[in-house]
């Protein structure tokens, strides 16, 4: 992004995190190898599937593998459109692998059908031993991936505003508004099944800050699926502020932009310069959405028992070859070290799916399908803002109105809110 901004980006600059093609197909091949041989020797170990049936572990492992295959197909499709679908075949070295691309629609149908087929074969949250198996693929993860796939499939990029209209390899041949409804219904079903009532097994963590350092439990019901990392302080030492030494030394590798900081609301739920709180350029972080403090380390932030000085040349942004290009550092994903004297080993979970995404996906799909936002759309966004600590306002609308009196946002205004959330 920095090289783009200053005009120094070129074709020789690889964006490693998004240059994917061979790795997903490597995973797909490994899944197919597993599927072709796993039943040769049945497991004696058993598990309980999503329907409560006792089954051999083979069945769960096959379903988990197919989930990963569907996940990586989607990672390909959202970048390239239609890609070759291999199915279950394990190709050998001398076989013809010059397979034609499937259409975008064929790929979406394949991914969704795979997820529908495996959801009952997987285990369901809560798992009996969270510490040992919370990271295992579960039925909620399969359904969450399906919702994400359906939302992408309904989006303008693949429908009414494709890159190349009429090219079925990179989108649908024609727009169908009902695709929004299909995505909304899938998310609604998830919410009603797992996130509603006294026996709900999914929900929002009480504290946004804790989402990325806790796995699923009865107390923390937000995380659906994550990649587990070892207990360490790698994230803190890699991304913590510069200008500190010893056990609280950081390398400041992630520098959030001003655009991201400005995206955080005022604490009344309105965008900066729009609500009752007047945005002060001399005190730009005052009266803001509490999530700002949980996401960004800025000038004046408390961190490792110090007050940060992040202006260029300040104690935590020294001039030289290594400094923060934006005067900001990442806070999100790190442990609670505001008042600590040094970094300690901390659990860091790379969350792939969480309940907050389900609420947002539902709100987006429902809002796009209807001509005006429904109460259910308001409820989804209000739940997120209430958890964040946004003020409820006189009518308990958490800023989701232009006059603090009525539910009067248009579809376009609600779209802006959802996209910002």
Please state what every model-predicted region is.
Residues 356-362, 372-401:
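Active/binding-pocket-proximal capping segment
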Residues 99-114, 384-421:
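Conserved catalytic neighborhood of penicillin-recognizing serine enzymes
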């Amino acid at each position: 992004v920095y090289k783009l901004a200053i005009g120094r980006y070129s074709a020789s600059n690889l964006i490693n995190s998004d240059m994917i093609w061979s790795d997903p197909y490597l995973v797909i091949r490994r899944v197919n190898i597993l599927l072709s041989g796993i039943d040769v020797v049945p497991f004696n170990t058993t598990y309980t599937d999503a329907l409560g049936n006792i089954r051999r572990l083979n069945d769960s492992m096959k379903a988990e593998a197919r989930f990963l295959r569907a996940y990586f197909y989607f990672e390909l499709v959202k970048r390239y459109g239609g890609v070759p679908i291999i199915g279950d075949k394990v190709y050998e070295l001398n076989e013809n692998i010059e397979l034609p691309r499937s259409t975008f629609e064929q790929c979406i149908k394949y991914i969704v059908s795979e997820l529908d087929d495996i959801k009952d074969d997987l285990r369901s949250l809560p798992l009996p031993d969270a510490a040992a198996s919370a990271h295992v693929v579960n039925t909620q993860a399969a359904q969450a991936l399906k919702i994400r796939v359906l939302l992408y499939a309904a989006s303008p990029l693949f429908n009414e505003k494709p890159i190349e209209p009429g090219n079925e390899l990179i989108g649908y041949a024609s727009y169908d508004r009902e695709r929004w409804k299909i995505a909304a219904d899938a998310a609604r079903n998830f919410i009603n099944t797992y996130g509603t009532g006294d026996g709900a097994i999914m929900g929002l963590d009480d504290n946004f800050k804790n989402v990325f350092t806790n796995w699923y439990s009865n107390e923390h019901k937000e995380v659906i699926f994550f990649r587990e990392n070892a207990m360490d302080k790698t994230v803190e030492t890699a991304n913590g502020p510069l200008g500190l030494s010893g056990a609280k030394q950081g390398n400041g590798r992630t520098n959030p932009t001003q655009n991201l900081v400005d995206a955080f609301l005022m604490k009344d739920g309105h965008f900066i310069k729009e609500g009752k709180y007047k945005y002060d350029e001399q005190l730009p972080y005052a009266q803001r959405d509490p999530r700002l403090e949980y996401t960004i380390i800025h000038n004046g932030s408390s961190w490792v028992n110090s007050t940060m000085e992040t202006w260029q040349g300040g104690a935590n942004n020294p001039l030289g070859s290594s400094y923060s290009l934006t005067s900001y550092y990442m806070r999100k994903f790190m442990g609670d070290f505001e008042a600590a004297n040094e970094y300690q080993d901390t659990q860091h979970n790379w969350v792939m799916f969480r309940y907050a995404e389900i609420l947002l996906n539902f709100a987006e799909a429902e809002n796009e399908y209807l001509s005006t936002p429904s109460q259910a759309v308001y409820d989804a966004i209000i739940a997120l803002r209430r958890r964040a600590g946004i003020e409820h306002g006189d009518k308990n609308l958490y800023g989701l109105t232009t006059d603090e009196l009525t539910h009067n946002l248009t579809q376009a205004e609600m779209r802006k809110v959802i996209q910002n959330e």
